[in-house]
UniProtKB/Swiss-Prot annotation:
This is Uncharacterized protein YubJ. Keywords: Plasmid. It comes from the Bacteria. The gene is yubJ. The lineage of its organism: Bacteria, Pseudomonadati, Pseudomonadota, Gammaproteobacteria, Enterobacterales.
Amino acid sequence: MYCTVKEIIRDVLDTDVPDSECVFAVVLTRGDVRHIAQDWNLSDDELETVMQRLDDAFEYGADVSIVHDVVRELMEEKRASRQVTVPAVMLEKVMALAGSEMKRLYAVGSENGGDGDAFVREEREAMDVVLQALDGEHMS
């Protein structure tokens, strides 16, 4: 809603929401948007166009893509920290394939005097974690 503060307050007060329900509101002034978009050095006319387009994008409270982006970010955070259970024999097969690929990546990274170890460092760390887990499975 791109309008004066009084119009925004009137609209919020007219919203049919129970007193106990929380809502989310964002206020962006022209100065805020100018600061956020400072790399583009917007003219006043361009800034006005951006404000009007933001009004269109947020017509129903939030542009769906913004909500989707926030939800995707949350799901990615959850995915990154989730724990999974995989039969050890299946994981060993995957690790054998990964080991072959690591050798190939190391060779590619070592070409022309490159540092093969640096090229596969993160992958090797991930493999070490999985191998430690497999060793723990075998010891049980």
